[in-house]
C-alpha cells in the first residue's frame, strides 16, 4: 500500500499535465465540431478551473435532449447531466440554475471528467457521437 501511495504521489504532476492535455484537446475538438456549444462557467479557462472537469451546454432542443443521455449510454460514453453534488436529484444543479439563462437551462448540460485512464481516441469518439446526435433529425 505504501509503495502505491509513493508511486501515485510521484506521478501527480505528470498525470496532471496529461489530463490537462486531454481537456485542452477536448475543448479544441468540441468547439470546432459544435460551434454553438457553450461552456458553463469558466471551466474552459485552465487558470481558474480544475484541470479534470468540463461542463458544456449543448445546442439541442428540449425535446431532443430527452434522448441524449440514453444515446450516449448506448455508445458507451459516461458523463453526467448534473453536478456531482446533485447526483440522484431531479432538481438540477443549483450552480447551473444560478449561472445559466432561462433558455440555456432548457438545453442539456453535460459534465465530462478526465483522468489518467482516458485517451484522445475516447475523446474523438465522444465528439463524433455528440456531433452526429446534434446534427441528426
Where are these regions (language model features)?
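Pyridoxal 5′-phosphate
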Residues: 2-137
